[in-house]
């Protein structure tokens, strides 16, 4: 497992590459920082916080999905918002955790004719929006969240992921 830490302007990002044929660490770090910075600029989330990102495989994603969502299958991205808690002044609060499954992300990118990096960026944005309180349980929520994703990705010169 490869672990590290990076900082976007407002977020300290801890990342871990557990398993999978993920791109190089510097590529992942840059991608996550860009996605988080763009998404944070469009949400009402905290001005400063820490965030953890786990890059893993479908086996671990399946286990996490089963344990926390009751769905015994792998998925592309999972988000785990951190509970609101008191933190000392000047200490960034933990915003939450995002987990990504390599095989599913890779397969979806190929099936949808997207670059792996663009699809991964979309999923990091999607996961971040969940941490910020957005959801897609109803049609109205889904439309609002998808539109916000489009706007964030457009700011990163990435096309509409739903087109």
UniProtKB/Swiss-Prot annotation:
One of its GO terms (biological process) is rRNA processing. Its cofactor is Zn(2+). Zn(2+) binds at residues 126, 130, 136. Disulfide bonds: none annotated. It is an enzyme of class 3 (hydrolase). The keyword Hydrolase applies. Keywords: Cytoplasm, Endonuclease, Hydrolase, Metal-binding, Nuclease, Ribosome biogenesis, rRNA processing, Zinc. Single strand-specific metallo-endoribonuclease involved in late-stage 70S ribosome quality control and in maturation of the 3' terminus of the 16S rRNA. Belongs to the endoribonuclease YbeY family. PANTHER family: ENDORIBONUCLEASE YBEY, CHLOROPLASTIC. This is Endoribonuclease YbeY. It comes from Chelativorans sp. (strain BNC1). The gene is ybeY.
């Amino acid at each position: 497992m490869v672990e590290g830490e990076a900082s976007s302007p407002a977020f300290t990002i801890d990342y871990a590459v557990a398993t999978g044929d993920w791109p190089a660490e510097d590529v992942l770090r840059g991608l996550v920082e860009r996605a988080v910075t763009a998404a944070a600029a469009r949400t009402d989330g905290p001005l400063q916080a820490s965030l953890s990102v786990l890059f893993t495989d479908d086996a671990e994603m399946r286990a996490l999905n089963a344990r926390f969502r009751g769905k015994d299958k792998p998925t592309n991205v999972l988000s785990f918002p951190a509970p609101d808690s008191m933190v000392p002044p000047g200490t960034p609060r933990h915003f939450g955790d995002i987990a990504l499954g390599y095989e599913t992300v890779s397969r979806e990118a190929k099936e949808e004719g997207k670059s792996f990096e663009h699809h991964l960026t979309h999923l990091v944005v999607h996961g971040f929006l969940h941490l910020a309180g957005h959801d897609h349980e109803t049609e109205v929520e889904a439309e609002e969240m998808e539109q916000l994703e489009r706007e964030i990705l457009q700011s990163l010169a990435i096309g509409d992921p739903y087109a």
